Amino acid sequence: LCDRRQRQMCIRDRIRHCAFIRGSAIIGKGSVVGNSTEIKNDIIFNTVQVPHYNYVGDSILGYKSHMGAGSITSNVKSDKTLVVVKDSRDSGEEIETGLKKFGAMLGDHVEVGCNSVLNPGTVICPNCNVYPLSSVRGVIPANHIYKDADHIVAKKEK
């Protein structure tokens, strides 16, 4: 499944039945790419789980992040314009990527709920959770729970 001519590198990972890897993909040690999952032009750190029915394109998934069943990273805007990373917090800062294809960046230990869509240019900082069926955009600060666009709450300390 990993072809050097395609600039792919897979190190001690688990590529399951019917997974599809294309473009330049780096998949870290102990990661799982599951059934009916497509990986395209990604950097996937160690022990990441993309276990079933996912699409991850032009994205970076941090250490021990997990994409729930059916969750995807959308990597192209519907109007085909260049992707801009927009900070959804008070600053409203915008970073122009200069790219038409730019998916999402997930920090370490991010959990994405089933059937969620991470829109182009989404950044989810470390230790965050995304509720199932969410449509996420912008920057989600570290240690937060994304319930919906109007309800992004800090995690309670244990």
Give residue ranges: language-model regions.
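Single conserved hydrophobic/aromatic residue that forms the stacking wall/gate
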Residues: 1-11
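Right-handed parallel beta-helix
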Residues: 8, 16-19, 24-26
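Surface-exposed extracellular loop regions of Gram-negative outer-membrane beta-barrel proteins
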Residues: 28-34
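Glycine-rich hexapeptide-repeat left-handed beta-helix
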Residues: 35-158
